[in-house]
């Protein structure tokens, strides 16, 4: 099974570059195995602008998309039973990813139902903080889970404020683009 393929035109026009592609077993117990096939992209243009302005060289904005390979494949009735577990684990894994990237005070908001290409999806917003040279950078993001025959998990994070001394950030535009990228995975 391959990872999902986000719209390559949208990615290149937005300055996104592939930073990682992997297949990782995320769960294995009681005869069930779950492998996440994932691609991760970063906003290389934003990173370059921040470095040129004297800021830290790091990933500031990222987007990921995963397709879950569940073996044995859950039957029709089992998808509904598995969905809450997949949503819960995806929220926690995304929060751990933010912490691994050095973000602090990671918290998630209430999960809500949204539509992704006609499929019911569960979206959970996240927020965090990144301390850079004595300044707090506010980070916002989201993780979305849906099932269209396969379980998909997609999301990302972006700076919402705190970088104004280096570059202009447009949190509303970043949020809009993140949601468009997620929808383009379907």
Residue ranges with predicted function:
Residues 136-161:
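Extended hydrophobic
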Residues 154-186:
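Surface-exposed amphipathic alpha-helical segments
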Residues 1-11:
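Secretory targeting signatures
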Residues 11-12, 81-86, 90-99:
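Short Lys/Arg-enriched alpha/beta "domain-start" segment
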Residues 90-140:
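Signature of long, low-cysteine stretches enriched in small and polar/charged residues
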Residues 14-84, 133:
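Secretory pathway targeting signatures of secreted, lumenal, and periplasmic proteins
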């Amino acid at each position: 099974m391959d990872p999902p393929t986000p719209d390559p035109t949208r990615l290149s026009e937005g300055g996104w570059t592939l930073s990682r592609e992997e297949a990782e077993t995320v769960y294995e117990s009681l005869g069930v195995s779950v492998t996440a096939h994932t691609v991760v992209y970063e906003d290389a243009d934003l990173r370059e602008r921040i470095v040129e302005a004297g800021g830290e060289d790091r990933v500031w904005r990222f987007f990921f998309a995963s397709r879950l390979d569940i073996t044995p494949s859950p039957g029709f009735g089992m998808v509904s039973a598995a969905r809450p577990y997949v949503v819960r684990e995806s929220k926690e894994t995304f929060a751990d990813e933010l912490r691994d990237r050095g973000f602090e005070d990671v918290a998630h908001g209430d999960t809500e139902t949204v539509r992704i290409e006609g499929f019911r999806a569960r979206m959970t917003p996240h927020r965090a903080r990144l301390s850079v040279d004595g300044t707090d950078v506010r980070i916002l993001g989201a993780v979305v889970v849906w099932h269209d025959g396969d379980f998909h998990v997609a999301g990302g994070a972006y700076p919402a404020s705190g970088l104004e001394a280096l570059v202009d950030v447009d949190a509303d535009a970043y949020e809009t683009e993140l949601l468009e990228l997620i929808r383009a995975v379907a």
